[in-house]
Amino acid sequence: MPEIPEGDYESGKKVFKQRCLQCHVVDSKATKTGPTLHGIIGRKSGAVPGFDYSTANKNKGVVWTRETLFEYLLNPKKYIPGTKMVFAGLKKADERADLIKYIEEECKKPIS
């Protein structure tokens, strides 16, 4: 697997607002169309209590890390065939790294 760039928080914030915020939050335990992303690093796929995941997500059994998120965000439907997520992915490595950096930093903050 290629080395993951460090990522830029502010650029990642823009990517999150443009590509993720419609379905996900990162600052609370709330769910929208998609589950909260708060605490995703180190969490097993399909594990947010009360969220109705696809069978594919529940059965994947991946633990989310910088590396697994980096690969997943390239092409979610290829990484987890059968996922309900409609997001096509981020082809640019820098955008994926920026988004991961933003999520990592937001997850360090107390939830609202």
From Swiss-Prot:
Family affiliation: Belongs to the cytochrome c family.
Disulfide-bonded cysteines: none
Predominant cellular place of this UniProt entry's protein: mitochondrion
PANTHER family referenced in this protein's UniProt entry, alphabetically: CYTOCHROME C (PTHR11961)
GO CC, alphabetical: mitochondrial intermembrane space
Annotated heme c binding sites: 20, 23-24, 85
General function of this protein: Electron carrier between complex III (ubiquinol-cytochrome c oxireductase) and complex IV (cytochrome c oxidase).
Alphabetized Pfam families for the sequence: Cytochrom_C (PF00034)
Protein name: Cytochrome c type-1
